Amino acid sequence: MKQNAGKDTKPGFNFWTTFRDVRIRRPLFIMLTAIFVFTILVTMLNSFVITEWQQKIRRTAAQQAGVVYQVRVMHLLKGVQEYRGRYNMWRQGDEKVSARLAELDNSLSLLISAVDEVDQEWGRKFGSAESWRSIREHIKALREEEDDLEPEAAFAAYTGITADIISLIYSVGDKSDLITDPELSSYYLVNMITNILPDLSEEAGRLRGRTSGFIAGNSLSPANKSAMTASYIRMHQLQLKLNRSVTVIAAYNPVLASALEIYISKEENGYRQFSDFFEQYMQGDITDIKVGSSSFFDRGTALIESQMGLYVA
């Protein structure tokens, strides 16, 4: 009598034994394992590539929107700068600018609406909504109370607004990944557009507005001349930064070289004309105060327009 009678003597399932039983040899097993691992790696790589591609698309879209946002804010900056300067001339006694002031008043409303439009779409993404709302409300409040302020106080108040606008331009460049471009030529180009040009136009705008006001009010005192000269020196230093940036960009990006050559040629020509005019005032070569204030302002405007030649409407 068998001792295991009535008992199931069939051995339990064993993975390795089963493989031996079906005679799957080691090379085949290794090949199957390699195929399995390779499939997993390919799947992971595809997922990574797709994710990177999607991020690049989003980053590119954000950068394009950042450029649009910055261009519209730059146009607003120019508008506020011109209004600040001409309003100062009017408060100092130059009545001939009143018609242009009315035009600028309407223009500011349109420029604000243009920024509103792009901020509604991208303000949350760029974290700019709150800053822009503050700037917009500040402009509205100042336009209502500007006549109650002393001319110098009104000029300073508008300068506070332009400082906030320039900060917004930099912030948008940062949040839209414009200023983090790893390419050297692209970095210098974005740095020029985001940092140097806004500061340069603001220094030129302050010099234009304050000097024209001094001339209109016949107040070219030694102290005022000293302040104008200091502003001119700061503008000159920023001009040198602009020239260096253009040189680097052209050297590393031949595609942009010809366009930048045209731009910097016009900009430097505008700078020379403004500098010559400024020196004439400092030397007292122009004596017709009222005509001189408008002439000086117009030369300053031509300079700023040449500086902003990279911003396409």
List PLM regions with ranges.
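Hydrophobic alpha-helical segments
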Residues: K2-A313
